[in-house]
Regions:
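A structural boundary/capping signal
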Residues: 1-131, 135-139, 143-146
């Protein structure tokens, strides 16, 4: 059965793989099912996973939720999912957009400590940088493509 994907859950494209390698060359992106947890709130992945671990066991898996704006950019948002006792990853954070799976890149190097972590972005063309500098993104933020 195919899971519902929206603009927020891209196919695994060359752009996605390139961004994934820039973030963590040792991990591979994969799809993770969204199964909203008990009393979990949208937009609160770190708190939701911590509460789920406390209530049912398992552990927190930090990483990056990967998204693509076709023909514009790919983006990684620092994120947390629940690693069940059987090792499977589940996104317990409810999705108001109805998406039933996310594209997730595990990252064992970073741990959420309560402070925001800047998203990682890579332009797919010569679009101006999102920061408003007027420079091409890959020059402005040093993510020049090979």
């Amino acid at each position: 059965m195919s899971m519902a994907r929206g603009p927020a859950t891209p196919p695994i494209t060359k752009g996605i793989l390139k961004l994934a390698r820039q973030i963590d060359a040792t991990s591979t992106p994969d799809y993770v099912a969204v199964e909203p947890g008990e009393d979990c709130l949208p937009g609160q992945c770190f708190e939701n996973v911590a509460a789920t671990v406390k209530r049912t066991g398992g552990s927190v898996q930090h990483g990056w939720r990967l998204r693509e704006q076709p023909a514009a950019y790919v983006e990684g948002e620092f994120y947390a999912v629940w690693r069940r006792l059987d090792g499977n990853l589940i996104d317990v954070t409810p999705r108001p957009d109805g998406v039933t799976e996310i594209l997730f890149l595990p990252d064992t190097r970073l741990v959420w400590e309560g402070d925001p972590v800047e998203p990682r972005r890579m332009m797919l063309n010569e679009q101006p940088c999102y920061c408003g500098s007027g420079m091409p993104f890959k020059i402005c933020h040093g993510l020049a493509e090979d």
